[in-house]
């Protein structure tokens, strides 16, 4: 899932490129932890019967998370199934046209599909971050019901000046620190270096102006224990 970096946010972040100087004299670049988030939406209209998982619960791909009450759809599916069974016998006996047979088969399959939509399942493994609706609420197709995040690997964007960029390359290992946990140290790696500069005049003419160039760098972190969570501030120390 591609993340876009709004220009306004880049400009704001660029003003705070270097958060602080570490004890060893190394600069640390500030970033905010992000994760791949997947929104789950209703595909049918109905009343929420119940949530099958709570916020913060781990979930598996294909796991049912939300049940929508749709007895009317189940009733319609039962009728469509019975009609098709009768149609099969008539078709075999030559008493029903192929057109009518196909129409009843489609109605049966369509009704069964809508019944499956009564249960909202997670398409990915991860953790249920947010539930946006309550039991008993009426929802319609497209309404966002929940968000699941894959926390097994997270990332942060940092912004480095032009002079520093030359020494960086994708795959390079870096150190990161979590201020909220007493400067706990984590290993990370540079996954993407974005080629377009930000926070600088469009027409750079002098060497002094080039020092104002900053580039977005995506740093990824394995997060097996899920210690790093979206929204946390992380400080990245680049190799010399």
Region locations from a protein language model:
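N-terminal beta-strand block that forms a small beta-sandwich/beta-barrel module immediately after a flexible targeting
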Residues: 10-54, 58, 220
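Short, charged beta-turn/beta-strand-edge "cap" motif at the junction between a beta-strand
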Residues: 65, 72-73, 180-183, 240
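Surface-exposed patches in structured soluble domains
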Residues: 32, 47-54, 58-64, 114, ...
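Extracytoplasmic
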Residues: 26-28, 35, 43, 123, ...
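Amphipathic alpha-helical coiled-coil/rod segments that serve as protein-protein coupling scaffolds
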Residues: 24-26, 57-135, 155-157
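N-terminal export/targeting signal detector
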Residues: 1-25, 175, 224, 235-240
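Short, solvent-exposed secondary-structure boundary/capping segments
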Residues: 41-43, 196-207
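Surface-exposed connector loops and short turns at secondary-structure junctions
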Residues: 3-6, 160-187, 211-236
């Amino acid at each position: 899932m591609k993340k876009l970096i709004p220009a306004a946010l880049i400009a704001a972040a660029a003003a705070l490129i270097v958060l602080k100087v570490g004890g060893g004299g190394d600069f640390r670049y500030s970033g905010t932890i992000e994760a791949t988030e997947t929104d789950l939406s209703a595909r049918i209209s109905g009343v929420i019967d119940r949530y099958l998982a709570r916020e913060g619960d781990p979930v598996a791909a294909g796991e049912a998370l939300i049940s929508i009450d749709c007895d009317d759809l189940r009733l319609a599916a039962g009728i469509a199934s019975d009609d098709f069974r009768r149609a099969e016998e008539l078709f075999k006996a030559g008493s029903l046209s192929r057109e009518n047979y196909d129409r009843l088969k489609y109605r049966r399959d369509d009704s069964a599909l809508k019944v499956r939509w009564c249960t909202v399942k997670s398409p990915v493994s991860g953790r249920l971050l947010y539930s946006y609706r309550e039991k008993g609420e009426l929802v319609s197709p497209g309404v966002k019901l929940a968000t699941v995040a894959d926390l097994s690997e997270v990332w942060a964007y940092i912004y480095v000046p032009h002079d520093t960029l030359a020494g960086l390359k994708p795959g390079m290992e870096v150190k990161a620190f979590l201020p909220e946990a007493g400067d706990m140290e984590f290993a990370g790696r540079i996954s993407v270096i974005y080629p377009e500069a930000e926070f600088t005049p469009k027409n750079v003419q002098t060497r002094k102006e080039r020092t104002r160039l900053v580039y977005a760098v995506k740093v990824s972190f394995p997060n097996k224990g899920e210690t790093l969570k979206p929204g946390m501030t992380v400080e990245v120390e680049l190799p010399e």
